[in-house]
């Protein structure tokens, strides 16, 4: 079957040749430049595709505004399938546009040869090209049968186990009023989403990390020394990364190696703590973390003058937060050693273990909580310094030139992170393999007396996940942006991985968190050693609850309320006639979008306008969250903004100057809302099934800002229109966003 065959064609652990399984194949093509009258199709050989007749080509479904997909199931040993992409006009009298080049070959779930771009020649000899992706996963016949059964069956209501805030509506057939059906496909209601955010699946996570400080305004480093030991192409291509200058224009300044390379002894403490679930009084599950030996020590009493000086020094390192986060930050600042005021999370792990994904997700979470957090990716430093053409030989431990170059950029990234912390930064995420004790000791020596280091090691023993990550890496990483042969890129990356495996040393020193087989979300282990303090505890709790299982999260405001019509703040009014119409359309949308999702749920606030909006949705459990209630307007509740301006001008001006921090008298600020939403975010991260969140403008602004990685200062200005659904698709490749406008 050739060397390019997918992992799914290999024998199972029991020695069978996949006789009990099938391959679920997904063909995807970017279509951001496809005109509205052209739709992507696939046609090809029998029996899998259908026909070489363009009129019988299979349409690709719109997975998002920028991606189309065709998926099908085949045996692992299926015959070679040859096919092509084509663009089909809606006008039948207009000829189809077939992609240029030879036929594509699919064998064992893998595309053979050069298959990363699809080229089309439009009118006027205009050439457009789109990236092409393929993914093949083995699925069992039982899974296929379950999916088909879920598709065919209507979800029947189950009994409620005495929980007052959970309900399931009756079957649609017995509903008193008919739903307002959507006349067309859901794609008809899709509207353009905002420009892709930093957290978008279209953006490689490492590219969003910090740029080197020594990168000048013109985009070049100082000095120049590029190792020539291991480039895949002998000629200097001068290719840029994200608009950055080519490697030949870059030079770099590295700290004196004599002050860096000397390693010191390992930390003596080896106590490993364990995590155990416990039951709180209100029945909610929590997590107990044994502090061990790392509890903060009390500092000596200070005079009044020295105390004032110290508070001035730490003012810039306090989080832009409220509630528990702010209180905990004060305690950590006052009680802990000076170096503990700054926290460095140092990633450890082999390539293709999800380090960068974890780093980006943790950065997003901490920023959303109000902590000044930055992501430093050593791979980005390396690419900016040495280019993107480094082969697997560059990463060999017996290649002294490669080792020196990689150590230099790691030291530079660490220096930049420490310098940023000394200017007031709070949490730095240091993203690299850091796979040897020598490298980790170097980092600890550089951080000594300046910041506290916690190692975060990701271990994965699931070959299927590793293989998937490798293929995603080749598709997304700038390291392989010039490698047109996909399978050649896979082979090179596997060689790189083998080089790291030969010298890998698990973390046993210092403070650390080990995540063992946690990425799949199906269990695994997490170990913590010498961990204490509020923020490290929150990080552990967040990591325990995150996973990579793809699932959609739908965010929508309630239907228009009577207070919306009157322009009044807050309140608990019913929905208007327009809101009732939206409630019916929303129910029809949910029925179409989540028809096969038996485990989906509907979350609302405790206010009646969200419950009335959800009332027409049937067949799914509904959960009320007080945390999803609208921002508390305090004494201004029920007033219009004009009344506030007239009767409380000082409050009106204070809110106008800083909507993020402004707190209504006896009410809440946006920062207060963020703090009460943290349990909601953790639960959304933990969920493996779709969730529909029906809430309010301020609350949805805060939730959306988390998923889109928007700065805190932008939250009060985020547009959150009525009668619009925002679909957030969470998965291994990042976050995809769609928007549906059901009515004006």
UniProtKB/Swiss-Prot annotation:
Matches recorded under SUPFAM superfamilies: P-loop containing nucleoside triphosphate hydrolases, Phosphoglycerate mutase-like, Starch-binding domain-like
Active site: 431, 460, 558, 630
Annotated control of activity: 6-phosphofructo-2-kinase activity is activated by pyruvate. 6-phosphofructo-2-kinase activity is inhibited by PPi, phosphoenolpyruvate and 2-phosphoglycerate. Fructose-2,6-bisphosphatase activity is inhibited by pyruvate, fructose 1,6-bisphosphate and 6-phosphogluconate.
Region spans: Fructose-2,6-bisphosphatase: 550-744
Domain of life according to the entry: Eukaryota
Annotated region described as Disordered, given as residue ranges: 1-23, 213-245
Binding site for beta-D-fructose 6-phosphate: 382, 406, 433, 439, 496, 500
Reaction it catalyzes: beta-D-fructose 2,6-bisphosphate + H2O = beta-D-fructose 6-phosphate + phosphate; beta-D-fructose 6-phosphate + ATP = beta-D-fructose 2,6-bisphosphate + ADP + H(+)
EC id: 2.7.1.105, 3.1.3.46
Region (6-phosphofructo-2-kinase): 301-549
Keyword Transferase: yes
Intracellular or extracellular location(s): Membrane; Cytoplasm
Residue stretches of biased makeup (Polar residues): 213-232
GO molecular function, one term: starch binding
A Gene Ontology BP annotation from the UniProt entry: fructose 2,6-bisphosphate metabolic process
Annotated beta-D-fructose 2,6-bisphosphate binding sites: 557, 564, 570, 641, 655, 659, 670, 697, 701
Domain CBM20: 17-122
Described function: Synthesis and degradation of fructose 2,6-bisphosphate. Regulates carbon partitioning between sucrose versus starch during the diurnal cycle.
Family under the similarity heading: In the C-terminal section; belongs to the phosphoglycerate mutase family.
The protein, known as: 6-phosphofructo-2-kinase/fructose-2,6-bisphosphatase
Annotated source species: Arabidopsis thaliana
């Amino acid at each position: 079957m050739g060397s390019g065959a997918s992992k799914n064609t290999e024998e199972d652990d029991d020695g069978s040749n996949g006789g009990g399984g099938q391959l679920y194949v997904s063909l995807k093509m970017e279509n951001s430049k496809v005109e509205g009258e052209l739709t992507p199709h696939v046609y090809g050989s029998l029996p899998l595709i259908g026909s070489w007749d363009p009129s019988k080509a299979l349409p690709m479904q719109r997975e998002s505004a920028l991606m189309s997909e065709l998926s099908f199931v085949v045996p692992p040993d299926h015959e070679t399938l040859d096919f092509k992409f084509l663009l089909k006009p809606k006008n039948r009298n207009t000829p189809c546009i077939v992609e240029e080049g030879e036929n594509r070959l699919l064998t064992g779930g893998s595309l053979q040869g050069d298959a990363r771009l699809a080229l089309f020649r439009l009118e006027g000899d205009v050439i457009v090209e789109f990236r092409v992706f393929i993914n093949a996963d083995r699925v069992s016949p039982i899974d296929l049968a379950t999916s088909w059964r879920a598709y065919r069956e209507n979800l029947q209501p189950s009994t409620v186990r005495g929980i007052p805030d959970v309900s399931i509506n009756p079957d649609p057939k017995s509903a008193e009023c008919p739903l307002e059906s959507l006349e067309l496909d859901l794609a008809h209601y899709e509207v353009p989403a905002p420009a892709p955010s930093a957290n978008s699946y279209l953006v490689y996570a490492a590219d969003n990390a910090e740029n080197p400080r020594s990168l000048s305004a013109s985009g070049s480093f100082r000095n120049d020394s590029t190792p020539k030991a291991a480039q895949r192409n002998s000629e200097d291509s001068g290719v840029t990364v994200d608009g950055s200058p080519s490697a030949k224009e870059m030079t770099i300044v590295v700290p004196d190696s004599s002050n860096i390379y000397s390693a010191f002894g390992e930390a003596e403490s080896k106590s490993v703590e364990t995590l155990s679930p416990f039951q709180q009084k209100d029945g909610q599950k929590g997590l107990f973390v044994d502090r061990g030996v790392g509890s903060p020590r009390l500092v000596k009493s200070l005079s009044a003058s020295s105390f004032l000086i110290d508070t001035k020094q730490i003012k810039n390192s306090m989080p832009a937060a409220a509630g528990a986060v702010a209180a905990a930050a004060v305690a950590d600042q006052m009680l802990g050693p000076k170096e503990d005021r700054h926290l460095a999370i140092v990633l450890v792990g082999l390539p293709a273990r999800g380090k960068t994904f974890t780093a980006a997700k943790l950065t997003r979470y901490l920023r959303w909580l109000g902590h000044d957090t930055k992501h430093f990716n050593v791979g980005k430093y390396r690419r900016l310094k040495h280019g993107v053409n480094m082969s697997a030989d560059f990463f060999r431990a017996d290649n002294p030139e490669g080792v020196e170059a990689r150590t230099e950029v790691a030291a530079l990234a660490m220096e930049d992170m420490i310098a940023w912390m000394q200017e007031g930064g709070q949490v730095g995420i240091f993203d690299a393999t850091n796979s040897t004790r020598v490298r980790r000791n170097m980092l600890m020596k550089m951080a000594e007396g300046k910041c506290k280091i916690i190692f975060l090691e990701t271990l994965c023993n699931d070959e299927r996940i590793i293989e998937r990550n490798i293929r995603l890496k080749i598709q997304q990483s700038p390291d392989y942006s010039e490698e047109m042969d996909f399978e050649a890129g896979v082979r090179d990356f596997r060689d790189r991985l083998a080089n790291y495996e030969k010298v890998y040393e698990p973390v046993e020193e210092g403070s650390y968190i080990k995540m063992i087989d946690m990425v799949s979300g199906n269990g695994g282990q997490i170990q913590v050693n010498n961990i204490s303090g509020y923020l490290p505890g929150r990080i552990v709790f967040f990591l325990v609850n995150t996973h990579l299982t793809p699932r959609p999260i739908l965010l929508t405001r309630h239907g228009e309320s009577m207070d919306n019509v009157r322009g009044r703040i807050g309140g608990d009014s019913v929905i208007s006639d327009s809101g009732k119409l939206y409630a019916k359309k929303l129910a029809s949308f949910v029925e179409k979008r989540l028809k096969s999702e038996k485990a989906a749920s509907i979350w609302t606030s405790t206010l009646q306008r969200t419950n009335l909006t959800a009332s027409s949705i049937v067949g799914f459990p509904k959960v009320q969250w007080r945390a999803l209630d609208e921002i508390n307007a305090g004494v201004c509740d029920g007033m219009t903004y004009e009344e506030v301006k007239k009767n409380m001008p000082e409050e009106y001006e204070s809110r106008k100057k800083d909507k993020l921090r402004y707190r209504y008298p006896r009410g809440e600020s946006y920062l207060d809302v963020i703090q009460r939403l943290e349990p909601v975010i953790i639960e959304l991260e933990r969920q493996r099934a779709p969730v529909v969140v029906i809430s309010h403008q301020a609350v949805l602004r805060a939730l959306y800002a988390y998923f889109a990685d928007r700065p805190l200062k932008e939250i009060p200005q985020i547009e959150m229109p009525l009668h619009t659904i925002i679909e957030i698709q969470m998965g291994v490749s990042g976050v995809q966003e769609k928007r549906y406008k059901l009515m004006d």
